[in-house]
Amino acid sequence: YLETGEEWPAAAWESCKTADAILLGAVGHPDARLPNGDLAGAGVIFGLRFGLDLYANVRPVKLYPGVAHKIHDEFKQVWKPNLVDFVVVRENTEGLYTPARGTLSRGGSDELAVDSRIITRKGAERVIRFAFELAVHRGGAPRDRKHRVTCVDKSNVLAGDRLWRAIYDEIAPKYANVERDYAYIDAFTQWIVRSPEAYDVAVAPNEFGDIATDLAAVLQGGMGIAAGGNIGDEHAMFEPIHGSAPKHAGQDKVDPIAMILAVQMMFDWLGTRKGDAALTAAAKGVEAAVAGVLKEGKTLTYDLGGSAKCSEVGTAIAEKLAPVRGRRAAAKKRAR
């Protein structure tokens, strides 16, 4: 944007509409602002979410063995790997992030700002149903292995959330093998820290899910290894959930694992959508390679307590994948 005055090339939107899947890198720079004061780059993210109707923001929260947590500027294991494995499904096209907002100015001074929060039946139904379908295919909560969907809202205060919870209660009985669970967003933020093992899938309105997933990233080791998917009925986009970290640009020091796990999520989604076993196997291979490097603990970037470069972590993960690729190539050759 600083060079061209455009957030992205005009042809990029058309390419995204026809792509099998979209992989998005982190965007944004504090010096790159639109004439209205908004950060340049947000139009790319929201343009794709709204334009392609990517209504389900899927955020896996999984702690891999070997990952230490940075608490009080010290690295130590606080949560246990076998007890942190849940997914937050965040509604992605409504809530406070819809462009229904404005300001009132008097005498050159902004006196009033309004952000309208939109919750519709259609929007709530489809993302809540998505969460239940996801729970059906998962292994359940670590504590008891029960399939469970937690409805996260603030229905004791907000009218939109009363509609949200009512729709959840309409959908839940259709999934007899999935347990119902409820949490107000303020309580949920402490419960996932205290007892993450109780959760399997949680579903939340847009802004609540946004806040909760950033907090949940701490449980898995931080934003540097947190990936997410933006999924609709016809399209999907995958991304690391962290920002662009311009202060680290060009230093080869940031953690590449969030982006690599975004690729893993993309392979998994494509494999399921297309019925392609090779893509599904690729997703499993990438995750296993990441898990192997994390468990060894020898090649980690600064955010995980190590001193390795970004490129060194990428190389270590690629080396873990090499034997897998070799075995599959040999098997394919024998099959011929």
Locations of regions flagged by a protein language model:
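Internal helix-turn-beta structural module
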Residues: T272-R328, R336
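Glycine-rich phosphate/diphosphate-binding loop of Rossmann-like nucleotide-binding domains
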Residues: G108-D186
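N-terminal glycine-rich phosphate/adenylate-binding segment common to multiple enzyme folds
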Residues: E3-R117, E207-G209
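A short glycine/serine-rich beta->alpha loop
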Residues: P30-L34, A245-K253, L304
